[in-house]
């Protein structure tokens, strides 16, 4: 029985930021019912990391530009004979709607940034053990509030990210589905190719080989080196087949 493992690697800084945002929001939403100190630290640590990422660049501007670019791509696809016009029109409508919603929304992450509890916890996360009850009595008492109260507050925090989530999910879904997986073969653990202006590499490896990729490159050219999980006794086959999509 084959167990495929998917690896994704960004080929530009914009995609790197988007994948990090997606990952952090998924972590925040994974267990929205905060019932313990461990649950709280998991949520607040990811919320703090998300705010750090959002503060580094013009995320909204980049997303709006990408939504417009995807609309232009769909417009060109609409002129291809035999294409599913209904599906294309549906996607174009979703892109326009997401763009309008994103443009009308407040500054991304501002609702989280202005929350007093998130700000207090965020300040202490950089200190080893800095979230003990004597360091953060506010968090301590919050964790003793009724579960329904905490659930409602977490739901409002996550809901404030909806315009971002909606746009980012649509963009990443379109990019991920823009290319098919094709079988490739590495020689002595190495593979390289042209990026063809791709934004994202997606690799599927069989878990049985216990190999992982080390990827370097950019949109015009990239290289992949396969390494054994067991660095001491693991073996990298002379010829290794894997699946690759340049999106």
UniProtKB/Swiss-Prot annotation:
InterPro entries: ZapD, ZapD_C, ZapD_sf
Annotated localization: Cytoplasm
One Gene Ontology cellular component annotation held by this UniProt entry: cytoplasm
UniProt entry keywords in alphabetical sequence: Cell cycle, Cell division, Cytoplasm, Septation
Entry annotated with the keyword DNA damage: no
Subunit and interaction comment: Interacts with FtsZ.
The family this protein is said to belong to: Belongs to the ZapD family.
Protein name per the record: Cell division protein ZapD
